[in-house]
Regions:
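Conserved beta-alpha-beta core of the PfkB/ribokinase-like small-molecule kinase fold
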Residues: 2-79, 101
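Conserved phosphate-binding/catalytic region of the ribokinase-like
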Residues: 20-21, 70, 74-174
């Protein structure tokens, strides 16, 4: 779930009712893609959403904005991620940084993947494809490292073609 879908009180309540039905155990995956866009969010909605998820997906620009919102302006990006991981009891925090790679933080461990070099046609859909590939791999029982690599490769492919939802070649759907 994300913040954009929570602009309306009706959809926000629906999302929260759905989240209420999810068992809170080690096997559940509750992914919050923060999506801080324009003025479509507020601190209360963001904080409550982070309390409801166990996987947070955020990009580097959103991390700066969130850090400012929570009073973490003068803290380096990795420390912000560790603080968020602990404060919100997350099992995973995914930080995407565009051409500067991406990080997956878990309690006690961080993974880094460089961004593949591609000719960028369109970045719309890059974050969503990253999240979808990552979660799809986890649901298939793949390791965090394998999920991270698949997410990076899928997102890079999406950036190399026009449109947010290209047909993925079979190598990305394994």
């Amino acid at each position: 779930f994300g913040s954009l879908a929570q602009r309306s009180a009706v959809s926000r309540n629906t999302i929260n009712r759905l989240l209420d039905t999810i068992p809170r155990n080690e096997d559940s995956l509750v992914v919050f893609d923060i999506n801080l866009r324009q003025d479509y969010y507020d601190k209360d909605i963001i904080c409550k959403s982070m309390e409801r998820c166990n996987i947070l997906k955020i990009n580097d620009e959103e991390l700066v904005e969130l850090g400012n919102m929570l009073g973490y302006e003068d803290i380096d990006f990795q420390d912000k991620c560790w603080i968020l991981l602990e404060k919100y009891k997350l099992k995973t925090l995914i930080l995407t940084c565009g051409i500067n790679g991406s990080y997956v933080f878990t309690p006690g461990k961080v993974y880094f993947q460089a961004t593949p070099c591609v000719k960028v046609e369109d970045t719309v859909g890059a974050g969503d494809s990253f999240t979808a590939a990552f979660v799809s791999c986890l649901l298939k029982g793949k390791s965090l490292a394998d999920a991270h690599l698949a997410a990076v490769e899928t997102s890079a492919f999406v950036c190399s073609v026009k449109g947010a939802m290209p047909v993925l070649p079979l190598q990305y759907v394994k």
